[in-house]
């Protein structure tokens, strides 16, 4: 291998190590939500990623007895606590969010800023032809929280996204859609 190719490989390796090192969240608690529409079920998938500097605060909220172990009961309680900070309505009617799935990473991953808490909430619906307005609000988890929210492209060809509106911080989201 020529000296030029070796140099190029060294630069690529160095750039790769920088990009992976900078991928860790630092001082924010990212709460990213995707919304998946279907006529009989609306799914909200939250991916919660505490940064290195806020991980201890988040862990204290989850690990209620402070023993350094996140039990299934503590994980479930935290998921329900997150749900209390969410509001969801369809055409002005508030609908309950039901916890369907929750997965928690290892504590070491959370402390490193790479661990993602995954929560899936379902809303049972029986949507018919017509126009719909969905409103979603995430009250978050404190001043270090940042939000992202987006709707996935529907699998059902009769569902049509008409428009999405977000607040500047994306804690508030509105979606207009149509079923034909």
Residue ranges and their predicted role:
Residues 7-17:
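Bacterial N-terminal signal peptides
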Residues 22-180:
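N-terminal soluble domains immediately following signal/targeting peptides that reside
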Residues 1-6:
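Positively charged n-region of N-terminal signal peptides that target proteins for export
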């Amino acid at each position: 291998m020529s000296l030029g190719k070796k140099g190029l490989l060294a630069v690529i390796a160095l750039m790769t190590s920088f990009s992976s090192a900078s991928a860790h969240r630092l001082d924010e608690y990212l709460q990213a939500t995707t919304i998946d529409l279907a006529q009989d079920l609306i799914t909200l998938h939250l991916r919660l990623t505490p940064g290195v500097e806020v991980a201890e605060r988040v862990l204290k909220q989850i690990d209620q007895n402070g023993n350094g172990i996140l039990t299934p009961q503590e994980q479930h309680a935290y998921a329900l606590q997150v749900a209390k900070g969410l509001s969801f309505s369809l055409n002005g009617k508030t609908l309950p969010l039901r916890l369907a799935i929750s997965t928690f990473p290892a504590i070491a991953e959370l402390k490193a800023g790479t661990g993602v808490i995954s929560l899936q909430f379902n809303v049972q619906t029986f949507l018919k032809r017509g126009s719909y307005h969905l409103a979603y609000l995430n009250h978050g988890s404190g001043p270090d929280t940042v939000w992202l929210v987006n709707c996935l492209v529907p699998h059902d060809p009769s569902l049509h996204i008409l428009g999405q509106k977000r607040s500047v911080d994306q804690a508030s989201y509105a979606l207009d859609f149509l079923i034909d």
